[in-house]
Amino acid sequence: MKFIDEVKIQISAGDGGNGVASFRREKFIPRGGPDGGDGGHGGSIYALADHNLNTLIDYRFTPVFRAKRGENGRGSDCYGKGAEDIVLRMPVGTIITNDLTGELVADLEHDQQKVLLAKGGRGGLGNLHFKSSTNRAPRQFTHGEAGEQFELRLELRVLADVGLLGLPNAGKSTLIRAVSAARPKVADYPFTTLYPNLGVVRVDAGHSFVMADIPGLIEGAAEGAGLGHRFLKHLGRTRLLLHVIDVAPFDENVDIVHSARALVDELRKFDETLYRKPRWLVFNKVDMLPEDEQQAVCTRLLQAMNWQERWFAISALTGRGCQALIYAIMGHLQQLQSDSEET
């Protein structure tokens, strides 16, 4: 199924039904009192988070939703029937904003989270409500209220604990295949990954975390070059970023340090908050280097980048170093959780 992560929709809740002016008409009761019933309420529109969904593609083809109006009231004190509500199922991680004002309407963070998007109009009042000691035969009634109408923007941001950053062909997809059950496409050409992939990394029977792989970034991504800029927003909810670097590129003219710095610059240009997230370096494809040069290459890169944070040397293809990496990630996430509980 095609991955669609941003759409616009129009929603219109139903109007309330009208009240009615009616009088009791029975044999031997020539002057029956008012018995006009109220109108039914219009249908409301809700959003419901569903963890079984992972794309907004359905809303690309059906962008307009209108709930029905409530029935009008009737005589004999009969109330009009309320209209049924509409429930729009959306993936967990969907952010809903008012497209005209930019106001946040809802952030669907949990499965089965239900949020009112547009409230149906209340039904009008029948003339029974207007009876008084001075007005025994009122003819007043009220019309139903209009339902709310909005133009909304739906934006899906995947929910993951760890996000993978890197240039095209850095080996991010191979890494997520190596440590999880996810099976993204892997090939020896740029932009094999065309949309985010999620993988659940099971460390042991009781511990796991979610890893997200987005399309590779290239220089100028913040201005729209390549594919990755569109998907950087999906890393906004992560708690840790892994900057995956290919230490053995096929093109020997590639300046690894320059490329790594360029990616970090793109991150900073796109979102300062994302740039400030905890970030580790992961040197991938070390198995492609002569064994006696592997440590020296990593050390040279660390010095050139003036890197003081955590780093790992792995081979996503052979699995070398991957176990130590995922245990370190799990420990980091547990520490973050512990710190948040203390505060």
Swiss-Prot record:
PROSITE patterns: G_OBG (PS51710), GTP1_OBG (PS00905), OBG (PS51883). Residues 160-334 form the OBG-type G domain. GO terms for biological process: ribosome biogenesis. Its main location: cytoplasm. Monomer. It comes from Nitrosomonas europaea (strain ATCC 19718 / CIP 103999 / KCTC 2705 / NBRC 14298). Mg(2+) binds at residues 173, 193. GO terms for molecular function: GTP binding; GTPase activity; magnesium ion binding. Residues 1-159 form the Obg domain. It comes from the Bacteria. The keyword Transit peptide does not apply. The keyword Magnesium applies. It is found in: Cytoplasm. Its cofactor is Mg(2+). It holds the Pfam family MMR_HSR1. GO terms for cellular component: cytoplasm. An essential GTPase which binds GTP, GDP and possibly (p)ppGpp with moderate affinity, with high nucleotide exchange rates and a fairly low GTP hydrolysis rate. Plays a role in control of the cell cycle, stress response, ribosome biogenesis and in those bacteria that undergo differentiation, in morphogenesis control. This is GTPase Obg. Belongs to the TRAFAC class OBG-HflX-like GTPase superfamily. OBG GTPase family. GTP binds at residues 166-173, 191-195, 213-216, 284-287, 315-317.
